[in-house]
Amino acid sequence: MKKLILLLFISISFLSCSNISEREKKINATEEIVLKVYDAQLSGDVETLKSLVSDDFTMTLTGKLDISGTYDWDSYMEFSKYFGSLLIGEVGGEFTDIISGENAAVVFLNGKMEGIGGKYENDYALRYTVNSEGKVSNIKEWLSDILLATQLYGEEISGQHVDPDKRFK
């Protein structure tokens, strides 16, 4: 009898450990969708990208640059062409990490490109929001404004030099 109870307990424990919760399934599905969108973005596969985003898709570039703002699909395509015109060569990026939730995931990458101002290596965080139909409805992008301005726009940023010994006094 003890063996039967022990065997039953082990079987139930094994089955409960092997079952993925609904939440985990949703997180995995979100991550899969987001990585497909990310790959399509980076490779320039507009057809695949379009098939994975919602009809009310928006993309938001944070910051204080002239290109910062929220774009719908058509204006995002125009923005992408403009961004590409600032580069020498292709868009490049090294995926570094992803943090996924049930309805959104944040992808971290190191952009590795060359712009009119020289080498452009900017750290990016992109939050992809996935709607109830499994389509990406919004991408929100964070990056260094200053690096973009100097390396892609060719602007010079000059600040006042502060003596390190007097900086916080």
List where the protein language model places each region:
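Bacterial Sec-dependent N-terminal signal peptides
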Residues: 1-25
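Short, low-complexity N-terminal intrinsically disordered segments enriched in polar/charged residues
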Residues: 17-51, 159-169
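Low-complexity, intrinsically disordered terminal/linker segments enriched in charged
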Residues: 138-169
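Hydrophobic pocket/interface hotspot
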Residues: 34-37, 48-50, 57, 76, ...
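Short, cysteine-centered beta-strand-loop-beta hairpins and adjacent loop/turn segments enriched
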Residues: 85-89, 113-121
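Hydrophobic/aromatic beta-strand elements that line small-molecule binding cavities or substrate pockets
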Residues: 93-98, 123-130
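A short hydrophobic beta-strand element
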Residues: 102-111
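A solvent-exposed, acidic/Ser-Thr-rich amphipathic alpha-helical stretch
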Residues: 51, 55-101
